[in-house]
Amino acid sequence: MEQNSSNLSKRSFELRKLLNRANHAYYVLDTPLMEDTVYDRLYRELLNIEKNHPSLITADSPSQRLGSTPAKEFVKVEHKIPLMSLDNAFNFEELQDWDLRIRKLLNQKNNFGILKTSIDFACELKIDGSALALSYANGVLVQAATRGDGVAGEEITANVKTITSIPLSLDIENPPSWLEVRGEAFLPKQTFDGINLLRKQQREALFANPRNACAGTLRQLDPQIVASRQLDFFAYKMYLPKDWDPQGENIHQPEAQDAALKWLKKAGFKVNPNTKIFKSLHEVQSFFDIWEKKRHKLPYTTDGVVVKVNNFKLQEMLGVTQKSPRWAIALKYPAEEAPTKLINLSYQVGRTGTVTPVAEFEPIPLAGTIVRKATLHNADRLQSLDLHNEDTIVVRKAGEIIPEVVCVLKELRPQNSTRLYLPSNCPECDEKLVRGTDQAATKCVNNLCPAIIQGALRHWVSKKAMNIDGVGSKVIEQLVNKGIVKSIPDLYELNYQMLFGLERMGEKSAHKVIESIEKSKTQPWNKQLYGLGILHIGEGNAKLLANAFASEDELSHAAINSPERIAKIHGIGNEMVESLQEWFEDESNQRIISRLKELGVQLKSTANDSGAIKSVINSSNKEVLGKRFVLTGTMESINRDVAQEMIEKAGGKVNSSISSKTTYLITGSNPGSKLSKAKELGIKIINEEDFFNLLSK
């Protein structure tokens, strides 16, 4: 029997309230209130009520986050308060100039008296996304607009409702009749990478960066597409009616930026947790310096620090110019993109024979370094850029990221320039280059190519592989060019006399090199396997394979005769299995293996090898049993699936988000926001080594 209308109305109200709270907890606080299955069931119940009783649908219902019909076009809307851009400062001196200007103006406004109120500065990370203006009427989101020209923007309410970190209704009693919230919509890095990977698979044009992807997403006419891209949002500014009196609330009209951010957070908005208040410019500069170094570890992109006068009365006294507020300035990070002129196109041949075109250009300062070269990756990239000699190109370098050519400014191309192509012959050995079907890489397949030999040797002696000291690139280059070393096993036949004749190689250095080469014979099996340089077999995968197969003999036999055994290992994909099979079937590689064994290189597990993974995988211990784990960042030796399997087999549980019930947060490189959340909640934080130690107890 159907419930009566008053009961249904009450039930739908309760469901809306609970589901909105659950959304806020999950997407903003990162602390789930309920399991996904519970949420889904309640959500379906609400959908069912609204389907049969459309009059009960409200604007703040979670069901309204997704509009059903794509818009035909966007409507222009005028901002009640202009959405201005900020002036920029590019160094400390320009920040000081801004400080002098605002103090001078405040003293003038104060009739040239001494300003009694000290100036505090609110420092916020400048999120690299798209500015939005959100309008709420009586606590319900009624309009969302882009910045546009600052005076008017485009109305994109249906799209913005799909952003789960933006509340559809304010989580406060007695909401104001009108409220405008300003903030930045952005695309998290991980989501951006996933979108571009999908677009690459579908042969669609890739987005240049998360900012462009965010802007393009917000202008999609179909909210379903916007929802699928999982945008996020940080609120940073609010405008309340001056006569608003929040009766019954402990929230009063904020008088400063830090208080406004607390208000926004209490009202249900996501605010950036890294905002700080400082009393001096030197503190501001220190904050900026810290984040200039740390910014690449954040899960979203930033392009500077916004410095604001914290006190709203002082902001009002300072006012605005025609384009920007006087009370705020953006202290920008060093440029990460810049135009420059192409000088030359050279080619690098890697250890696997892959030929990579490299653009050489006039030096430019980028991200704190002077950049002269940038990789073009492969022939496809070279072709898509349509690169000509003497072109003006745009180069990007973000932090530790390898410089890359973003685009060509064809409007500045010289009239008589000629197009550049990948050579048909290897630039090192002059053998014919080969490109396989559906392969992006163009390769030299000559095993005697000096560049391939040098690359293989550099990889073999590296710290992550055989860790042979004293054999750097210069030594390897001399050994190969003189014909002393033609393959990896030749290293183990070197003697002092062979090394003495090399540049900068004295008797003492030669002795150390011979000792280090001899010592490398007992390196752990996984490092030896990694050192062989098999395509697609990285350091972590080598550990997995070495754990599953105790020797080269076992692995070689499986690769050639029963590759399905290798495919069953978690973390090893079909591409890796095929690569292993191809490598071990190659006669020249088999000769390398045979010679290494003859010369005393183990190529098998020994008693000294770490068996941490093997000893744990089927065990159960009290340190893990019943405990809850969350992972963040990239693990060095294993992937997340393997780590999860290890935890579960040891009796633990893996969750996707941090909550008060979490026992351990396992951190890899480049940890995300979960790290700061864990610190706030006092969760025990461990690294990869701690994790293995925990499992082996």
Swiss-Prot record:
- Pfam families, per this entry? BRCT, DNA_ligase_aden, DNA_ligase_OB, DNA_ligase_ZBD, HHH_2, HHH_5
Tell me which UniProt keywords the record has, alphabetically: DNA damage, DNA repair, DNA replication, Ligase, Magnesium, Manganese, Metal-binding, NAD, Zinc
What range(s) does the BRCT domain occupy?
A: 619-697
What is its EC class?
ligase
- The parts of the chain that form a coiled coil are none
UniProt EC number: 6.5.1.2
The family database entries (CDD domains) matched by this protein are listed as: BRCT_DNA_ligase_like, LIGANc
> Mind telling me which PROSITE patterns this protein's record contains?
BRCT, DNA_LIGASE_N1, DNA_LIGASE_N2
Reactions it catalyzes: NAD(+) + (deoxyribonucleotide)n-3'-hydroxyl + 5'-phospho-(deoxyribonucleotide)m = (deoxyribonucleotide)n+m + AMP + beta-nicotinamide D-nucleotide
**Which residues are recorded as binding NAD(+)?**
D36, T37, V38, Y39, D40, S85, L86, E124, R147, E184, K308, K332
Kindly give the SMART domains that the UniProt entry links to this protein: BRCT, LIGANc
A GO MF term: DNA ligase (NAD+) activity
Q: Give the InterPro entries listed for this entry.
A: BRCT_dom, BRCT_dom_sf, DisA/LigA_HHH, DNA_ligase, DNA_ligase_AS, DNA_ligase_CS, DNAligase_adenylation, DNAligase_N
Annotated active site: K126
Cofactor names from the entry are:
Mg(2+); Mn(2+)
Q: Which GO terms describe its cellular component?
A: cytosol
**Signal sequence range:** none
Q: Name one GO biological process term.
A: DNA repair
Q: Which residues bind Zn(2+)?
A: C426, C429, C444, C449
Reply yes or no: does the keyword DNA repair apply.
Answer: yes
Q: Which family does it belong to?
A: Belongs to the NAD-dependent DNA ligase family. LigA subfamily.
* Protein role: DNA ligase that catalyzes the formation of phosphodiester linkages between 5'-phosphoryl and 3'-hydroxyl groups in double-stranded DNA using NAD as a coenzyme and as the energy source for the reaction. It is essential for DNA replication and repair of damaged DNA.
Q: Which HAMAP family match?
A: DNA_ligase_A
The molecule here is called DNA ligase
Organism annotation: Prochlorococcus marinus (strain MIT 9211)
Originating gene? ligA
